[in-house]
Swiss-Prot record:
GO cellular component, one term: lipid droplet
NCBIfam families found in the cross-reference section: squalene_cyclas
Protein name: Cycloartenol synthase
Function (record text): Oxidosqualene cyclase converting oxidosqualene to cycloartenol. Required for the production of sterols.
GO molecular function, one term: cycloartenol synthase activity
Family membership noted in the UniProt record: Belongs to the terpene cyclase/mutase family.
Coiled-coil stretches noted in the UniProt entry, renumbered to this chain: none
Organism: Glycyrrhiza glabra (Licorice)
């Protein structure tokens, strides 16, 4: 049976700044689990498999089974059902809240955070499998049980047509189909294994033109593996790292996720590295293409991309740029004397790779550059300490649920989920009852603040200050983020108002000042806040976005969510510490509020870039403006936002927005106009904040009916469609949202609507 280990090290090759707080790793123990446990797990797996085409999202049941043993519930209060809004009383809401928080508290780990599934993208695991296969570490790192669960996951998320999507709910793409087919082959599956699944996968690939039509990221992965030629790639010259920083196209000016992925890619491209050519590789060269491998026109293949993958088609200027670099510059850099420059660029690239590895304790900023950096360290020296330090950190990215083992989009969402959960529980006003839960959450948040800047000259490494920030996941990861810092600060400020004998000692004021300093340092000239850093270049740089699958990746754009979170945190801070940097904070809030007003769409919504979608963005838009001192009466933006939200309420009383809203930028309901507990939570929170109850509380009562009746027998809420997103087009799982936002919305509803009536 699989066991979730929390905050444990266990390897001499692991480094940590805070004793591994927040680390979550699944380990298989053959001796663990009674026959009843194993039967329950098998039932969950079979149930997922049988319904995989209608319910594509797992419900994180293995973790729930694990915690039911570790943190059993003392009592399960009887479920409440309400027929109509007349049945919604303070007592029914309180019971629903207690049932929900009782259950959610059992999912809290001993270090105070809420673990959970952060999977969703389907292009992450293949990168890991390819890297481990090339380096010969596949069987050493992934046990037979790991490999079995990874195969289960890949087969479970194969679409009916035989292909694989960009993410678990998406239609088949060439990027997803080729990479997942290749991953299965490298994991030991034969070309005709299973009940025709491999054949169906191959038929989808060949029926859509073959692997020459894969996206640029896919071309790079296939090239290092040896099943595609480097000459079929558009150039990724490492020399870009030698350009002066003053140029707008310098990678140091790009969004950190973008530059940190293209950094190791440029190293591998500069070296034209190809892994060992094995019989499986030779076989894949035959399996993936519609014509013999040696007959492929690689120059023509450079710009081929399947229409299913084409979210961001290359503008003409990009095709001209890549063709010029490919034809004229690359031949010079591949031969003496130009080769000297190439060697210098490769040396610079690997220095930046090592800096990133060292300062994230070998977690790296995300899963894509994690495995690429690991491969680069092996290419530089297969016996290097750096490669060995990378290996144990692979497990930080692996998560298992009833659909199998997946690679997550980060090493988890620990701080983010814990900060939200603390705010949600506090909103319920049941603070004393859940004091132990809040105390543990408080401890986790305090232990996860980043206490130092990265070492050395930050400008040399293109890094922003970190001291005082909160990361998305763990202190070991350490990359500072504007909204994570804001949500962390909001949570500790709320907790500081509660008696320390209930929730523990408050955070030292100096550490609060450090957090405020980070937030203030991240405001752009237009008043908006981007994610990790300031916006360092121009939007026209998107013209050279080479990733056909993703939108808006080249620079760190300002977002309504980050801007709103910053306003909320600074407003909360200002109330408790009115003397600290008062004028700067006030000026920052005013500029940020003006940015939010400017970015509102004509229909009253805001586009959400990190959650689905207009419901999420509009919750942040409204919350930010209200925190800045505006109200329904004096702000037309808030009035329009309320109108927008009310126009989307469904007959069931809830809201339900599809991920299609994100990619198409047009509001779309979930299929069959079903409501969703998470969207409903966001919409309720926005409307309650905008004092909807004073005008007409009926929409809020109807939403409360939907949430109360959605609660499951054990106090959990159902896992519905996927609710997280990044880069406009790729969806990601936030497993805790189904619990956090119904709790938060009903908590606010109880004390700001029912108790104030």
């Amino acid at each position: 049976m699989w066991k979730l280990k929390i905050a444990e090290g266990g390897s001499p090759w692991l480094r940590t700044v805070n004793n591994h707080v927040g680390r979550q790793v699944w380990e298989f123990d053959p001796k663990l689990g009674s026959p009843e446990d194993l039967l329950e797990i098998e039932k969950a797996r079979q149930n997922f498999h049988d319904n995989r085409f209608t319910h594509k999202h797992s419900a994180d049941l293995l973790m729930r089974i694990h915690f039911a043993k570790e943190n059993p519930m003392n009592e399960v209060l009887p479920k409440v059902r309400v027929k109509d809004i007349e049945d919604v009383t303070e007592e029914t809401v309180k019971t629903t809240l207690r049932r929900a928080i009782n259950f959610h508290s059992t999912l809290q780990s001993h270090d105070g955070h809420w673990p959970g599934d952060y999977g969703g993208p389907m292009f992450l695991m293949p990168g890991l499998v390819i890297t481990l296969s090339i380096t010969g570490a596949l069987n050493a790192v992934l046990t037979e049980e790991h490999r079995k669960e990874i195969c289960r996951y890949l087969y479970n998320h194969q679409n009916k047509d035989g292909g694989w999507g960009l993410h678990i709910e998406g239609p088949s793409t060439m990027f997803g189909s080729v990479l997942n087919y290749v991953a299965l082959r490298l994991l030991g599956e034969g070309p005709n294994d299973r009940q025709g699944e491999m054949e169906k996968g191959r038929d989808w690939i060949l029926g859509h033109g073959g692997a020459t039509f894969i996206t640029s990221w896919g071309k790079m992965w296939l090239s290092v593996l040896g099943v595609y030629e480097w000459s079929g790639n558009n150039p990724l010259p490492p020399e870009i790292w030698l350009l002066p920083y003053v140029l707008p196209i310098h990678p140091g000016r790009m969004w950190c996720h973008c530059r940190m992925v293209y950094l190791p890619m440029s190293y591998l491209y500069g070296k034209r590295f190809v892994g060992p050519i094995t019989p499986t590789i030779l076989s894949l060269r035959k399996e993936l293409y519609t014509i013999p491998y040696h007959d492929i026109d690689w120059n023509q293949a450079r710009n081929l991309c399947a229409k299913e993958d084409l979210y961001y088609p290359h503008p003409l200027v990009q095709d001209i740029l890549w063709a010029s670099l490919h034809k004229f510059l690359e031949p010079i850099l591949m031969h003496w004397p130009g080769k000297k420059l190439r060697e210098m660029a490769i040396k610079t690239a690997i220095e930046h790779i090592h800096y990133e590895d060292d300062n994230t304790r070998y977690l790296c900023i995300g899963p894509v550059n994690k495995v690429l950096n690991m491969l680069c360290c092996w290419v530089e020296d297969p016996n290097s300490e750096a490669f060995k330090l990378h290996l144990p950190r692979i497990y930080d990215y692996l998560w298992i649920a009833e659909d199998g083992m997946k690679m997550q989009g980060y090493n988890g969402s620990q701080l983010w989920d814990t900060a939200f959960t603390a705010q949600a529980i506090i909103s319920s006003n049941l603070i004393e009852e859940y004091g132990p839960t809040l105390r543990k959450a408080h401890t986790y948040i305090k232990n996860s603040q980043v206490l130092e800047d990265c070492p050395g000259d930050l400008s040399k490494w293109y890094r922003h200050i970190s001291k005082g920030a909160w990361p998305f996941s763990t202190a070991d990861h350490g990359w500072p983020i504007s909204d994570c810092t804001a949500e962390g600060l909001k949570a500790v400020l709320l907790l500081s108002k509660i008696a320390p004998e209930i929730v523990g000692e408050p955070l030292d004021a100096k550490r609060l000042y450090d957090a405020v300093n980070v937030i203030l340092s991240l405001q752009n000239e237009d008043g908006g806040f981007a994610t990790y850093e300031l916006t360092r270049s121009y939007t026209w740089l998107e013209l050279i976005n080479p990733a056909e699958t993703f939108g808006d990746i080249v620079i760190d754009y300002p977002y309504v969510e980050c801007t709103s979170a910053a306003i909320q945190a600074l407003t909360s801070f200002k109330k408790l510490y009115p003397g600290h940097r008062r004028e700067e904070i006030q000026c920052c809030i005013e500029k940020a509020a003006s940015f939010i007003e400017k970015t509102q769409a004509s229909d009253g919504s805001w586009y959400g870039s990190w959650g689905v979608c207009f419901t999420y963005g509009t919750w942040f838009g409204v919350k930010g403006l209200i925190a800045a001192g505006k109200s329904f009466n004096n702000c037309s933006s808030i009035r329009k936002a309320c109108e927008f939200l009310l126009s989307k309420q469904l007959p069931s009383g809830g809201w339900g927005e599809s991920y299609l809203s994100c990619q198409n930028k047009v509001y779309s309901n979930v299929e069959s106009n079903r409501s969703h507990v998470v969207n409903t939570g966001w919409a309720m929170l926005a409307l309650i904040d905008a004092e909807q109850a004073k005008r007409d509380p009926t929409p809020l009562h109807r939403a409360a009916v939907y949430l109360i009746n959605s609660q499951m027998e054990n106090g959990d809420f159902p896992q519905q469609e996927i609710m997280g997103v990044f880069n406009k087009n790729c969806m990601i799982t936030y497993a805790a949202y189904r619990n956090v936002f119904p709790i938060w919305a009903l908590g606010e509803y109880r004390h700001r609507v029912l108790q104030s009536q």
